[in-house]
């Protein structure tokens, strides 16, 4: 099976499959009402291929990038594997028990709030209560991990801005928190694009280090004793968890053992007959007081653009930006933000969501015509809330009504700047030995490389 946006050149001459012929013969149109010609034009080289039951915003798991080994590991990134560990804890000797930790992405909470018709706070408590009724020991919110990711991105952008020149091109800085986009950059775009990727680790990667390193030491546990599960909106996070080096902690342990989508967790909840008591989400610091659900200033993501923009405006130009105005350009998934003074544009940032916009952005970047200092890049149109692990119908299309409801819920969550977290500042000192220490670079940053397409592939269908 191929991804519907497969970019392998040899695929472009392949004939349509029977399924495609059937679609053409019965005259069915795409769900958004666009004509086939228009759809083809919009996708450009991201041509539609055979039997597209898997989407690029789910993963890039066509046979050009997923190896057999990765395929076997992906089969373990499932609810079955999660429940297997829970059942082993119930049957085996206590000395062999594993401590189960579940970390929930903030973009997953609106899904549960919408699905169960609850406020986002009540949905958080219900989810936590359910997971603990299954046998999970701790449930964390990944917002604190996003704090670190954003703060390190802010510092990196300012450094790049100062170092940028015609001889040493450091800009634009492209975000790297979206694993679908990063995998595409490494597997397809390669060396011309890799240097522009932000080296700050994604929230999932940082959370893995927090759980398997900091939290493990606080609890006097070896990292191997912890089974860490992340609940996320999209399938790409599963591939991110498998990436060697990218998601491995200082002690050599894999930061995330299993990734489950919001939809997979909801399915477990629906199939369970457990009596659930609402419980507040845990904190890494053992606080007894319940922490309110908060988010960063992103439209439907972790908010790297907004927070880096404000920080850069202040650090580079002494300008305090309160309200950010997003100006839609090509379409609703491509926005521009500028900082202007006396008619001069000082900073020009952009958000490019969805691979149609990413393709256009990359073409301009390769030609040296991309005017931006910073681009927030996400594989999913409309951002992380539209992850295929929570916002799609059974036939694989976006559930627009659900997505709109989730966007409304998410926008109502209070915004907290990462700089305001006292816990983060404490962790910089206690865990990382200072904000500019070598350990910060080692724990919170990574590197990317151009990866040759794999010849040993495996077709994946989720």
UniProtKB/Swiss-Prot annotation:
The modification Phosphoserine is found at residue 35. SMART domains: Fe_hyd_SSU. GO terms for molecular function: lamin binding. GO terms for cellular component: lamin filament; nucleolus; nucleoplasm. Its main location: nucleus. The keyword Transmembrane does not apply. It is found in: Nucleus. Keywords: Nucleus, Phosphoprotein. Residues 1-19 have a biased composition (Basic and acidic residues). Pfam families: Fe_hyd_lg_C, Fe_hyd_SSU. Residues 1-43 are annotated as: Disordered. Belongs to the NARF family. PANTHER family: NITRATE, FORMATE, IRON DEHYDROGENASE. Interacts with LMNA and binds to the farnesylated C-terminal domain. This is Nuclear prelamin A recognition factor. The gene is Narf.
């Amino acid at each position: 099976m191929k991804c519907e946006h497969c970019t392998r050149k040899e695929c472009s001459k392949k004939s349509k499959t029977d399924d495609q012929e059937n679609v053409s013969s019965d005259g069915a149109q795409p769900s958004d009402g666009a004509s086939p010609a228009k759809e083809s034009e919009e996708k450009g080289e991201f041509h539609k291929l055979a039997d597209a039951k898997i989407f690029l915003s789910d993963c890039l798991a066509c046979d050009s990038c997923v190896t057999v080994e990765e395929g076997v590991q992906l089969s373990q990134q499932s609810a079955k594997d999660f429940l297997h560990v829970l059942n082993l804890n119930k049957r085996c000797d206590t000395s062999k028990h594993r401590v189960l930790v579940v970390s929930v992405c903030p973009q997953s909470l609106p899904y549960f709030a919408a699905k169960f018709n609850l406020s986002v706070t009540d949905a958080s408590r219900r989810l936590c209560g359910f997971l603990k009724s299954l046998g999970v020991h701790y449930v964390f919110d990944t917002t604190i991990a996003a704090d670190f990711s954003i703060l390190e991105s802010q510092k990196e952008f300012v450094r790049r801005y100062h170092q940028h020149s015609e001889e040493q091109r450091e800009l634009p800085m492209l975000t790297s928190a979206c694993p679908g986009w990063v995998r595409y950059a490494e597997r397809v775009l390669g060396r011309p694009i890799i240097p522009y990727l932000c080296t700050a680790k994604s929230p999932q990667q940082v959370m893995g280090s927090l759980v398997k390193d900091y939290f493990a030491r606080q609890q006097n546990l070896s990292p191997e004793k912890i089974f860490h599960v992340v609940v996320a909106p999209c399938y790409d996070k599963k591939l991110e968890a498998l990436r060697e080096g990218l998601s491995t902690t200082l002690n050599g342990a894999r930061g995330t053992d299993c990734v489950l989508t919001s939809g997979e967790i909801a399915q477990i909840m629906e199939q369970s007959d457990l009596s659930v008591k609402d419980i507040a989400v845990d904190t890494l610091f053992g606080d007894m007081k319940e922490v309110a659900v908060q988010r960063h200033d992103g439209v439907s993501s972790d908010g790297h653009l907004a927070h880096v923009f404000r920080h850069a405006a202040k650090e580079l130009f002494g300008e305090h930006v309160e309200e950010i105005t997003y100006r839609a350009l090509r379409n609703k998934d491509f926005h521009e933000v500028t900082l202007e003074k006396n008619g001069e544009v000082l900073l020009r940032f952009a958000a490019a969501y969805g691979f149609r916009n990413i393709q256009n952005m990359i073409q301009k970047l390769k030609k040296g015509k991309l005017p931006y200092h910073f681009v927030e890049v996400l594989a999913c149109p409309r951002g992380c809330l539209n992850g295929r692990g929570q916002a799609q119908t059974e036939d694989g299309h976006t559930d627009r009504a659900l997505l709109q409801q989730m966007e409304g819920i998410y926008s109502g969550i209070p915004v907290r700047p990462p700089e305001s977290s006292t816990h983060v500042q404490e962790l910089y000192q206690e865990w990382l030995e200072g904000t500019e220490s070598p350990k910060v670079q080692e724990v919170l940053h990574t590197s990317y490389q151009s990866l040759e397409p794999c010849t040993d592939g495996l077709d994946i269908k989720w």
